[in-house]
Structures are given as structure tokens and as C-alpha cells.
Amino acid sequence: MTLEEIRNEIDAIDPKIRALLMKRFDCAYQVAEAKNRSGDLRVYRPDREDEILSRLSEEVAEEKRSGYLSVVRKIMQASRMYQYGLLYDWNEGLFEPLIRDIVIPGNASRVRVRLSRPNRPNAMSEILSMIGDYGYNMELMELISDNREEGTVTFELTILGNLNETNMKKLMFQLSMECMIFRIEAVG
């Protein structure tokens, strides 16, 4: 095959992938509806995701496995983002407990948060990816503690963006749900 023929084949595959992803998002919508009805707004289930990744990778050739798992992880991250966005839209008042007594200036351009996650592969790269997926950049990331005994890491992040924006509020909500400890430290 020529390079052009190979690219044409890839171009023919991409719409099929899109159709399957849209079907998967339809399922994610139904999951969010079920969670909303039950009152359990937790979407992130690392144990279930690990099980899925293990099962799906069994029949993938070793030389393709890490790339394949990277794509599957990204699909799961996008699904969680979609579900958390829906849950946020459907439930008033989810954001207010996160800001406590913090005053958000109208011209706020950054948010400093502290969060703890299990110290495992992709734990922090998922956070960084999530920030970018919501359309924001990180200005600073500082390791506060690496608790090897408990297997956790705590970071302080400064995210560039306005906490008055709905997408930033959705990001904060998702971070609060996916981190063991989450706190908005300052807004400026």
C-alpha cells in the first residue's frame, strides 16, 4: 500500500470510531442519569477502571498494549468529564461547599488548590490532562507531601482561569470527587 492509500484507510476508520464513541457517550449519559436518581454522584471508580483495562488489554499484542491502554484511559477520562458535567448541571449547589468562605473576585485569573491522590501510575497525569480538557492551563505544581506509608501524594496546583466560569466550577467539582482530599486554597 502507498502512504496515500494507508491514509485513506485511516480516514475511513475515523468515522466508525466516532460513531462508537458517540454510542459510548450515550451510555455514559444513562449512567449519569442512574447515578443522579440514586443520589450517588461518584463517577470515578479506579477499581472498576483497573479491571476494565486489564480485561481489555488481554488480547492486545504487547507492542501495541501501552498505546492501546492510553487511548482507553483517555476515553474513560472523557466519559467521566461528561458525566460530572451532567451531574453538575442537574444539581444546584454542588459548587458552593467547595468555596466555603472564599470570595471570588470578578476578575479572578487563577485558582490555587490542594489535592491528594493515591500515588499510582497516571494519578497526576490524569489531573493535568483533566485541567487541559476543561480548557485551562496550570501555572504551578508543587509536591507538598509524598506519604509512602499511606501511598498518597499531595500537590498544590495553581490553575490559570476564572472561578466564575461554569467550566472552571465543573473542573473543581470533578477534582473534588476524584481526589481523596481537595480544597480550594485561594482565588486571585
Where are the regions a protein language model picked out?
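Low-complexity, intrinsically disordered terminal regions of eukaryotic RNA-associated proteins
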Residues: 17, 22, 34-38
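Short, charge-rich amphipathic alpha-helices with coiled-coil/heptad character
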Residues: 1-3
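Long, charge-enriched, surface-exposed interaction segments in small proteins/subunits
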Residues: 46-88
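Amphipathic alpha-helical coiled-coil segments
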Residues: 6, 10-13, 17-20, 27
